[in-house]
């Protein structure tokens, strides 16, 4: 899942809604230790995979099962062995083909008869990430995996010793071996333990389930509420939904404390820790022993964990860039959900497609910017400041407990 707080979120989360067992297939080699270089595309790890002598880009995603694009399916024609309902990150469900992929190579590792799914013909996040498939957790279930974001290397092995370092116990709750751990959210003396999925296919640090946030206001500060569009998933752009902007004073992962964590809520069943965790330290997943190790990099600041937040966000609707969500309530008298975005800082974006919009970066990230909008109701054109959202300026109580 890719987080763009200014623009949009891409959620690369794939799970079956029926009792399908995707822990099928194997690694050919008896003993293997591979040091694999990866590139970061929009903050996510992407690795080279070889199929029939041709190299393809695959997302390395612990929050998903093995999957390929419809284009790659048509090129390779693996056998279809069934169909299943697949849930995206917003909880929407669509029917997909289940395949048995005969052989693919991830450097010196050969995956044989891997079970996975074929995504739809029009898969916008595959197009924008320029990837052809997903290396999922079901392929890693008998291995130890180490992701080192500083060196941009992934180790996959069945003979790595993790030593006697502290670890988090991993839990598998589905038949695709997606790794869950428990973290702690704390505010003063009050704290709760929260089960989260470690999802390397999500760029931001932490997504908290919407209902969990509402139920735990003792440890979570709700600083803004809005209804809008934040996400693009495997089934396309998500529908308009209610979202919360949250402040969590402390989040503890593997005995390491992250302070002043600013996040938004997710509308699916899982809370998730994403790939931004990799910026802070080396993550090792021992799937066989069910252990997650996290080793903090030197000279890393964990005092403030926040994305670049702005007063409103932009999405795509009816093939046009539009206002997708408004966090600053004082702007609701000036702009509307669905107002067409004509330009950003004088750059005409009316003809931009989704991938161009996702590639746009504000420089520098914390400055104010100017957006030209066409009012969805009146057609009036006006220029509006898109400002950095300084949390202390907007913090307010949106929810009160009934006595």
Where do the model's predicted regions map?
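Bacterial Sec-dependent N-terminal signal peptides
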Residues: 1-24
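Pepsin/retropepsin-fold aspartyl endopeptidases
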Residues: 18-403
């Amino acid at each position: 899942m890719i987080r763009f707080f200014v623009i949009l979120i891409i959620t690369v989360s794939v799970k079956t809604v029926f009792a399908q067992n995707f822990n099928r297939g194997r690694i050919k080699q008896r003993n293997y230790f591979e040091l694999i270089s990866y590139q970061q595309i929009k903050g996510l790890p992407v690795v080279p995979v070889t199929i029939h002598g041709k190299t393809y880009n695959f997302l390395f995603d612990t929050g998903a099962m093995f999957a390929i694009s419809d284009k790659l399916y048509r090129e390779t024609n693996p056998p279809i062995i069934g169909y299943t309902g697949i849930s995206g990150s917003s909880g929407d469900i669509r029917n997909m083909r289940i395949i048995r992929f005969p052989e693919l190579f991830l450097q010196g590792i050969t995956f044989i008869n891997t079970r996975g799914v074929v995504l739809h013909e029009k898969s916008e996040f595959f197009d924008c990430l320029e990837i052809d498939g997903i290396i999922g957790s079901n392929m890693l279930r008998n291995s130890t995996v180490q992701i080192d974001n500083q060196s941009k290397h992934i180790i996959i092995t069945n003979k790595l010793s993790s030593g006697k370092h502290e670890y988090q116990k991993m839990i598998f709750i589905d038949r695709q071996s997606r790794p869950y751990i428990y973290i702690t959210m704390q505010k003063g003396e009050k704290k709760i333990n929260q089960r989260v999925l470690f999802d390397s296919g999500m760029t931001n640090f932490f997504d908290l389930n919407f209902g969990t946030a509402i139920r735990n206001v003792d440890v979570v500060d709700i600083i803004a509420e809005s209804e809008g569009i934040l996400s693009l998933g495997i089934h396309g752009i998500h529908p308009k939904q209610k979202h919360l902007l949250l402040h969590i004073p402390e989040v503890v992962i593997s005995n390491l404390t992250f302070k002043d964590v600013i996040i938004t809520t997710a509308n699916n069943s899982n809370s998730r820790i994403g790939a931004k965790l990799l910026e802070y330290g080396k993550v090792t997943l021992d799937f066989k022993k069910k252990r997650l190790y996290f080793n903090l990099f030197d000279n890393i600041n964990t005092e403030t964990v926040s994305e670049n937040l702005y007063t409103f966000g932009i999405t795509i609707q009816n093939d046009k860039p539009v206002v997708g969500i408004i966090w600053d309530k004082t702007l609701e008298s000036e702009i509307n959900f669905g107002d067409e975005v004509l330009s950003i800082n004088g750059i005409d974006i009316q003809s931009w497609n989704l991938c161009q919009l996702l590639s746009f970066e504000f420089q520098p990230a914390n400055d104010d910017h100017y957006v030209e909008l066409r009012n969805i109701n009146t057609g009036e054109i006006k220029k509006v400041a898109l400002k950095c959202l300084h949390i202390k300026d907007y913090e307010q109580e949106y929810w009160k407990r009934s006595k």
